[in-house]
Structures are given as C-alpha cells and as structure tokens.
Amino acid sequence: MMGVDEMLDQLKRACAIAKKDIRIYYLNGPVVIFGILVPGFLFLAFVIGRDLSINFLVAGLLGMTVFFTSTSVTPVIAPTETQTRNLERLAAAPISITTALFGDVLASVFFGIAISLVPVLLGVTFGVTITHPFILALGIVLAAFCFSAMGLIFSSIPTGATSTVMMLSTMVRFPLVFISGVFIPVGDLPSWGQALASLSPLTYLTDLCRYSFQDINNHYPVSVDIAALAIFLMIFMAAATKLHERSLPKRL
C-alpha cells in the first residue's frame, strides 16, 4: 500500500505527463480528425432533413462528442511515443505504468470535457433547458474518464503506427455509436438491440444526457447509468494496465 505522500507524488507525476500530452497531442492530426471532424460530419449526415426536437439532437450530439473526443487522445500517445523513442525515457523514469497511463487519461479527459462544452453551449443558445445540471456534469466527467480508459486498451497494441491503432478504434467506436441510443432511442430498438445497447458505455451517457435535458425521458434509472459508467471505467482501466504491462517490453 502506498502512503499518502507517495500517492501525492505519483499524482504530481501523472499531472506532469498530462501537461506534456496536452502540449503535444491536442492538435495532432488523428486527434482532430477522429475526435472532432468525424463525429461532427456523422451527426450532420444524420440530422439533415429530419424533423427531430432540439433536445433530442443536443443530447445525442453531446454523448457522441464526449465519446469520440475522449477516445481520440489516448490511442495516439503510446504508438507515437514508441515511434519517436520517447517511451524509452519514460520507462526509465521513476514512475509506475499505472501513473503514466493515468496521466494520459487526464489529458484525454480534459480534452473531452472542453470539447463537450460546445454542444452544451449550442443547446442553451437554441433554447435547450438543462433541468439537472449536476447530473449532466457528473455524467460527462465520469464518461470522459471511462472513454479515455477505453482508448488506452486500443493503444496497448505494441506498434509505432498510429494508423493501425486508430483503424482498430474506429472499427469499435462506429458500431457502438449506432447501438447506443444516439440516433435512435434505446426504447425504440428491438429486444436484441436493447441487449446490445446495454453492453455499450455510451448508452448510459446518452441516457444521462436525455434525462438532464427538458422533456426527454431516459431509459434507465439515473443510478444505473452512473453505476454502469463507474463499472466500465474500472474494467477498462484494469484491462488497460495489464495489457500495457505486457506490451511495454515489446515497444522498447
């Protein structure tokens, strides 16, 4: 067990890593393309020509924005640092793998939360009322951590090619968007679709967004949504740590 002083020291190191990631990767090509442009155009392709309420649209856009932005930073970091050999210096530093990964997650979380403010502000501008702001904020922060940890799993592949990791992550992320209630409410899906939706963490964030906006019914109880995101976060973080511990020697 680590003492309080050691935990604080590791947290400071994680924050230093996050600061480095923010400076280097926020304007990285794959992050901008897969984190901002792709979900933006995907959303426009869905909504143009359809008569949908602004509350429904903003809730779906917000969920998709947090999902894509938070899963776009962490997959880029490990392969890029493998290619540039920066990972060797990091591995030689007095820092644990868990701390290094947590630093990457923090950078991704900040990015996801910052970009998520855009659809929120757009919604408020167009008359959307946020009836449960605390629940919405909690859901966004928890989901940003969850999706960032999910991105770490993609980056555990021992490769220096960012394109390989982003291709794999895209193959997972796109199907999740279409089964998670972003475009079609979970309650309108067939029984097998609802079963699949329950396996996606994005479903629970979208459900919280629907609950937080005026006149939109959510499919699951709020407590279930929050608990599900927390459970997915723990599973993703534990799996990512184990996978990176195994793949690190192959990167050096």
Can you describe what each PLM-predicted range is?
Residues N55-G123, T170, V177:
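Hydrophobic alpha-helical transmembrane segments of multi-pass membrane transport proteins
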Residues I24-T71, T170-V177, A230-F236:
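Hydrophobic alpha-helical transmembrane segments of multi-pass membrane transport/permease proteins
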Residues M2-V38:
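Aromatic- and glycine-rich beta-strand/loop motifs that create alpha-glucan
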